[in-house]
Amino acid sequence: MLAAISRALEERDQTPGHGARVAALAEPIAYRLGWDARRIGLLRFGAPLHDIGKVSVRREVLLKAGPLTLEELAEIRVHPRAGAHLVLPLRGAREALPYVLFHHEWWNGGGYPIGLRGCAIPVEARLLGIADAFDAMTSARPYRHALTPERALGEVDACAGTQFDPELAALFCETWSTQPIAAAS
């Protein structure tokens, strides 16, 4: 059921395949971190669900071509908590909670919804946040063109230590600078 909601959401906000791409971007780094098969399986399960809370966001806000108002930004920032409310009651989905709730937390504490910082952010969410941002940057959106993978890797590197865990960002850039990345459409 959650997977169907996630796919419907991707169609609704014109990001088809986003969750699968995020999982594919994060998985090689998870292997390099020594995650076991169970943990990799949770990544594959949780990554496509990470934005499920966007079902609570109005479509016109998700597709807005210009800058968001403060009210619209507040609406967007509710999606991690809304997603947590969707997955928490479902026994089999609870382990996806770090991916859903914390993927917009920043290494320096400037993220949302809670403002966690550093290692207080679950490593699963820190890794997913990098993969999520990279896929967003390399995907065309109503409000901007897609960046090349090389330019997006430069952005990940530039945000290491502020938005992203510096060690994970370095590992992500090292991994994906030596492998071809198919940019999203």
What are these regions (language model features)?
Residues M1-S185:
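Histidine- and acidic-residue-rich, metal-dependent catalytic cores
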